[in-house]
Amino acid sequence: MDIYIKKAIIHQFSPDDTELFLADKFLNITPKIEEYLRKKIERVYSDEAKTGIFEEENPFFNHITDDLLETSVTLANLWKEEFSISENLKTNDLVFVQFSKEGVEHFAFLRIALRETLTHLGGEVDNPIKLTQNNLPGFGTGADEALVVNLQSRKYHLIEKRIKYNGTFLNYFSENLLAVAPKISPKKSIKELEKTARRIAESFNTDDFQFQSKVKSAIFNNLEESNELSPEKLANDLFDNNLTARLSFIDQVKEAVPEPVQFDEIDASRQLKKFENQKLSLSNGIELIVPNNVYQDAESVEFIQNDNGTYSILIKNIEDIQSK
């Protein structure tokens, strides 16, 4: 991912008086600062990101200008108005970034909750371990909330967390601050696909381990082949001999996932890794991990249902066995 950090500014929100401490200067983009911001932005392009496209007249989008200082102050104040109602307020850094990705201008807004951390102070003899406040999380940790916007296409990627207010949980970031209705994340969409497939299979008394393995294989194969999941194609793969089940699956899936699950600009590697193997836990304590391509090959693995209702698993053509 070719990301070039141009400018960044950081403001701070204090929970004590719900005030903002506004900076008036940009960050000095040292190599380490550049790496830190770049990694935070890269993590937004994950399977947990909600996506959408801002309408041209969207008020939030129209606050984003070339003047990063003015933009950041305006958006920080708008954010504070919506976030301050939360019942669990913490000190947060609000980071605003101008950057280019693959040569296209982008904007990022990162909310990073600061942590308490134990620090070893080498010069202290009697008490070298101190509890320090307002520490940024490490390089490998994502922002608590993040918005990345392609300023050319108006497409956005959003990582958001709900806040609790009057006993209810609110998607304050998307609903109130951005005033948008994003698509649900690929990760959540896939969970909906799995859940719906099992529900349909249960209604036809076919939800056994073989069907669940079939679901995993279908998701893996479709992701690997086309980098997207189409409800219609999955329905054909899962319920090829049952028209009623196919139509029911498509109708029920589209209530939660109205469009194909696409991984455009989003890293699908975590989902591919999740579904690349079949994991079976047997009643006798044996656990098997079988790669999908082997699992689907009758010359390698065969499942036999015995007359007494039990199963036997025949593993064939093994050239070598190693103990690990």
Label for each model-derived stretch:
Residues 1-274:
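Long, hydrophobic alpha/beta structural blocks
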